[in-house]
Amino acid sequence: MTVEPLEEPINAEATYEPLIEAERQAAADAAHDNKGRGVLRFYELAKKQEWQVRDMAWGEIPPIPETRAGASDEKKERRRAVWRSVITQQLQADELAVSMAGQLLNLAPHHEAKLYYSTMVQDEARHVEAWLKLANEAGGVAERDPHLDELAKMTLEAETLEEKVFQMQVFFERLIIPRFRLIARSSRGTLLEDLCNRLTIDDGIHHSAGVAYERVLMEDASKQTKDRLVKAANRLLPIFVEHALWRPKERAWIGNVMRETDIRRLQEDVQDGIRMASSLGLDVSDIQLPFAA
């Protein structure tokens, strides 16, 4: 498997060269009124990039960072609990993503999109398998994020395909990429780092494919459909803020220390999403920011 460079920017910009090239080609396809071909490019890339959970170095490297020698048993367990909570949140997200990807596969009317979503369903199921194995290696699971469950429910119950694609792929999949990079940077030499590097690429493809397909959907979208997207964003953003700032009890102290940094990143994430919405032809002037972003 080709992995990305060790020192990456902590943002969502692609650094995996085949993905960068696919994005360039998809943008050119859109400019030449061949948006469906752009979606198909990400199907082809997803097939080439496909990996298996057995490819990871199970039993050869530690699952999570090890506490330094000489630390007390209490400190070791507290540190393991922190990593278990990190793994649990990603497992939860990918369990929900399996359901959402299945919906997209069933609802998409375009052949190219159905092909792509057939790979995305497999990706999300593979991610769940890997997180389940990693959680077991790390000693089990921790507390679920209630706000993430609520966000997933909103996306699953969204009435239009345009809303589902925008919320899951254009918005959420992009936001997780910087988090994977942060986790990987903090867990050198572990299975956790390896998995996060793999998922950075996979979710980058999911996001870019979503942008390409949303262009297809927006081509014939009515003003009413576009207005629904903005209204959905206004319902979603306050819950997204709660999710982004939430910490389980194992990491509550980190949340207090990192609150200013978290809010700054959150503001950047929301502004990024608004720029993305604008680039797809949505009138973002009615989006209500949950804070001074």
PLM region spans:
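Terminal targeting/low-complexity segments that flank the catalytic cores of oxidoreductases
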Residues: 1-102, 106-114, 137, 141-144, ...
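Amphipathic, well-ordered alpha-helical segments in soluble domains
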Residues: 64, 93-100, 127, 172-179, ...
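Short amphipathic alpha-helical segments with heptad-repeat character
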Residues: 88-91, 95, 118-121, 125, ...
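A structural feature that tracks compact, well-ordered secondary-structure segments
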Residues: 98-104, 117-119, 177-183, 195-198, ...
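Amphipathic, soluble alpha-helical interaction motifs
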Residues: 100-107, 130, 134-137, 183-186, ...
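Carboxylate/His-rich catalytic cores and anion/metal-binding grooves
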Residues: 110, 115-139
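Active-site-proximal alpha-helical scaffolds that flank and shape metal-associated catalytic sites
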Residues: 131-207
